């Protein structure tokens, strides 16, 4: 974040990215409710879906469990997580440390779950993207109001000779010899570096063209929204500019005038008063504290 255009945040520890994806899904719904609440979601320029890819390491972390519970409780149907389950960690098979049935755990949270395997019944391996797309489409149709977890059984480092499905592929580089073997297995010259297929290049250019067309369609939808909603458009412009609303300072000054000099007030009570004073002029203010609002005064009236 801050170095590359288009990146909105950089995550660190395992599980943080999983929780962040849920935050993005939650944020989409909040933003749409703030700026375009009356429009059917599919027709709103602010509606979009969140796609995330995670591995066993993310699933093992406690933060992902807490965030997953929140996502189900809030019915974040705009979120789909692809769970790459290759059963490999640095020390060997993930069964050494991950014993539970992950899909059943997520079902218990309230998620829609399904699975798909690139490992074929005869033991061969095929990364069947079309088949996976069908499973995702089925999930989208079956569970529009639930977050979705699709478990994909895969092989790490396939088809690298001597490295496929091997724990050493998880935490260290493949090495020159293994990379040469991978190139050969994929039909490339093992001695050639930094090569991009014409077919891959053409595909990437088509993706860019498709993106430009989608962007044009979105711009038209957004412009129509701006013309139809001048007040909301003004709010959008202020939010994008990162500016405070009119009346912000006055709201705090008015609140300060209500406090009696020399009369004690609990810090949490003062904090709650400030939050509600700001919320009256700042509709984008959003927060909470699990189930402790009545105690720590974070609930907005």
Task: Kindly label every feature range from the protein language model.
Residues 1-51, 213-301:
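Thiamine diphosphate
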Residues 3, 7-206:
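Glycine-rich ThDP/TPP pyrophosphate-binding loop and its adjacent helix/strand module
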Residues 210:
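Active-site neighborhoods and metal-handling regions in enzymes and metal-associated proteins
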